[in-house]
Design a protein with these regions (language model features):
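Core nucleotide-handling region used for phosphoryl-transfer chemistry
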Residues: 1-358
Length: 358
């Protein structure tokens, strides 16, 4: 899940092909359905992204009482409106009526706090939870931004690697090389430097043991001279999320490495896709499928994000999407951090009965 920012954006307005009273407001590569003539191309408005949780007064102001997602009907999700995918909400809240939204857009002003908008945090089911303890040496995972939201993240033609995005639960494992200490955590707890105590029934620990991840991390540490190694992988299967990939997690959970980070002389470095592939193959640990290597082509990658999964080899369910990285790690001024983005399939966004646990 990405970082929540509520900012003003310059809009490009398109006709809605199926409704005379509606139009499509484009933000980046995302589009949100709006009332006809509410905005013109070049106007600036506030964009409330997917995953935003809105306060009741703002929901009422927007005329959306009872129409949003979640138990409290307060969460923005992707929906189809008259056949067109609508992602996020474009609006001009009364609380910002006196502001110059064009200037705010140029400054990148974040209105989340002013508007009372918060980020939705996925619930943690019992089989993923456990007793927690502080773990300052734990290497956390980061937020992956939506490429359609930030299309300038990659340069056309730059060498990239795209892997399949698996719908499971991210398992963070850190090995401290000097002591052999192993920490396990989730995305959310990892950000707080909290680890889950080892337990037979915990899904993360079951995956760590089943795939002998400490052995992989120890080999990486030895080869690269790392003090700490973070192995980041997706635990998946029936019982983890709604997409099962033909695996019954209650017997042996599915698992695939999607990233590895090392601490060498106090500097954190993310391994390149080729390095991750080499280490996982050498130690018989599954890795997420690589679906594309080559020059960055947004249209081609967006098409590749659709379809069925390739993890099981049987096309057991829809594909969640892609995660795209440069072939060589680099800094992104767009995200002010690591260059890594995702493209999520339309089928995944609009599926019915989906689960979104951490």
């Amino acid at each position: 899940m990405s970082i929540l920012k509520v900012v003003a954006e310059r809009l490009v307005i398109h006709p809605h092909p199926n409704a005379d009273a509606l139009e499509l407001a484009e933000v980046g590569r995302l589009r949100a359905v709006v009332a006809k003539d509410a905005f013109r191309t070049g106007d600036h408005a506030v964009y409330l992204p997917e995953g935003s949780v809105l306060p009741e007064p703002l929901i009422a102001e927007l005329g959306l009482t009872g129409r949003l997602a979640g138990a409290n009907k307060d969460r923005i999700t992707a929906v189809r409106l008259r056949g067109e995918l609508s992602q996020g909400i474009v609006c001009r809240p009364k609380a910002l009526a006196d502001l110059d939204l064009a200037a705010a857009a140029a400054a990148g002003t974040d209105f989340a706090e002013v508007l009372g908008v918060t980020k939705w945090v996925p619930p943690i089911p019992v089989h993923l939870a456990g007793d927690m303890h502080p773990a300052e040496d734990l290497l956390p995972w980061l937020d992956v931004e939506n490429i359609r939201r930030y299309p300038a993240m990659f340069t056309p033609g730059e060498p990239v690697v795209a892997t399949e995005k698996i719908h499971g639960s991210a398992c963070l494992m850190t090995l401290v090389a000097a002591t052999g200490t192993v920490f396990a955590s989730s995305k959310g707890f990892g950000k707080q430097r909290l680890a889950i105590k080892e337990a037979d029934g915990n899904l993360y620990w079951r995956a760590i043991r089943a795939y002998d991840l400490p052995r992989l991390a120890a080999a990486v540490a030895a080869d690269l001279g790392a003090a700490r190694v973070g192995v980041f992988g997706e635990v998946y299967g029936r019982g983890v999320q709604d997409l099962g990939y033909g695996v019954q997690a209650s017997t042996r959970p599915g698992y695939a490495v999607f990233d590895v980070a090392v601490d060498v002389d106090g500097e954190i470095r993310w391994l390149t896709p080729d390095e991750v592939a080499a280490f996982t193959a050498a130690h018989d640990v599954p890795a997420v499928p690589v679906l594309y290597r080559g020059p960055y082509d947004e249209a081609k990658l967006a098409e590749l994000a659709e379809g069925v999964e390739t993890v099981s080899g049987t096309g057991a369910n829809i594909r969640e999407g892609l995660v795209v990285r440069p072939a060589t790690e680099r800094y992104s001024p767009v995200t002010a951090g690591r260059t890594i983005g995702k493209l999520v399939s339309t089928a995944y966004l609009t599926r019915k009965g989906g689960t979104e646990y951490e």
